[in-house]
């Protein structure tokens, strides 16, 4: 599987092709408790998962997986049915609190699974 990694961390960014897990992990750890994004794109998939993006600000994380299903582009995200629908601002956009993750180890688990398998279990991102 061929990936590209792109990021913005506190206003400065970059990208690289064919990252190793260490490259992804370094950017992910840098994202912890600051504002920015990390995106992993899969280059050789015509259907199924295409990309995983993490948006972060103030210890709040929004994780989205984009995929092609039956010629439609769909986005899967974390959903906490026990949380409120109150809106949280991340990078200037407002998102329902029930889609926000505050557990950094969960964010790490999701991006690791995507990097190593090319997908994320639907019980993690629905």
Which ranges hold each PLM region?
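A short, Trp-centered hydrophobic/proline-enriched beta-strand micro-motif
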Residues: 36-42
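Acidic, proline/glycine-rich low-complexity IDRs
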Residues: 1-33, 44-49, 60, 64-126
């Amino acid at each position: 599987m061929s990936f590209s990694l792109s990021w913005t961390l506190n206003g400065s960014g970059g990208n690289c092709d064919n990252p190793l897990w260490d490259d992804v992990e370094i950017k992910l750890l840098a994202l912890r408790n600051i504002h920015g994004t990390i995106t992993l794109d899969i280059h050789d998939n015509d259907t199924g998962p295409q990309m995983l993006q993490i948006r972060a600000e103030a210890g709040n994380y929004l994780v989205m997986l984009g995929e092609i299903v039956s010629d439609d582009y769909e986005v899967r995200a974390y959903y906490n049915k026990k949380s409120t629908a109150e809106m949280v601002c991340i990078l200037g956009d407002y998102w329902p609190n029930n889609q926000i993750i505050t557990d950094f180890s969960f964010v790490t688990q999701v991006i690791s699974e995507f990097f190593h398998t090319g997908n994320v279990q639907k019980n993690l991102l629905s």
